[in-house]
Amino acid sequence: MSGKKKSKSDTVPLDLDNIKPLDHLQAVPKTRKMSMTSIESADEPGGFKEVLLPPTIKEFDELEQFEAFVRDETWDNDFDYFHGRLHYYPPFVLKECHDEIEKIKPTSNKNSSKFKRNLQHHIKKHLIKDLEKCCGYELNFDKAEEIESFDKLTWKFKDETDHGFSKEEEDKYDRHWKIELDITSHNDSALVDIDMKSIPIGH
């Protein structure tokens, strides 16, 4: 399931310096019930249980659009239930070629130690910090798991912490969630793929 959606980000420009943090949790939106489905229960033969469907995947090709989408999910009280994908040239690549895509060096890919170093810097010093502002709550990613094959290199980040909220507040509204962030670079292109999921825990 994937789709593009018109959202607040079409009318409200992204301003990373003026995003209001999420101070308090609220009840799960009533619309979440529409994302529930019944499946046969393995515990009770012939019985059924309610499960939450995976969130619809939203696709983006610009970093600012993607960050605005993450911000909007918090504004819409869906910070714990979204899935976004971004396919983009990182800012350091665009800066090096002066925004002329056809001038990107063919060596700008996961096999270049310079590209890899610049991408890691972009992720740690900019991307994750900016995504934290857009989320409106703390992101506490552990050291990324690094998976490399011949054609791609993926860093897998995961945050299963309380995101800066108290356990009591999370329990009160039943808002426990984890964030998964996968960042992939390829051996034949400077394009980078980001896959970010926020998923309720215990549903």
UniProtKB/Swiss-Prot annotation:
InterPro entries: RGI1, RGI1_sf. Belongs to the RGI1 family. Its main location: membrane. This is Respiratory growth induced protein 1. Signal peptide: none annotated. It is a peripheral membrane protein. GO terms for biological process: energy reserve metabolic process. Keywords: Cell membrane, Membrane. Coiled coil: none annotated. It comes from Lodderomyces elongisporus (strain ATCC 11503 / CBS 2605 / JCM 1781 / NBRC 1676 / NRRL YB-4239) (Yeast). GO terms for cellular component: plasma membrane. Involved in the control of energetic metabolism and significantly contribute to cell fitness, especially under respiratory growth conditions. It is found in: Cell membrane.
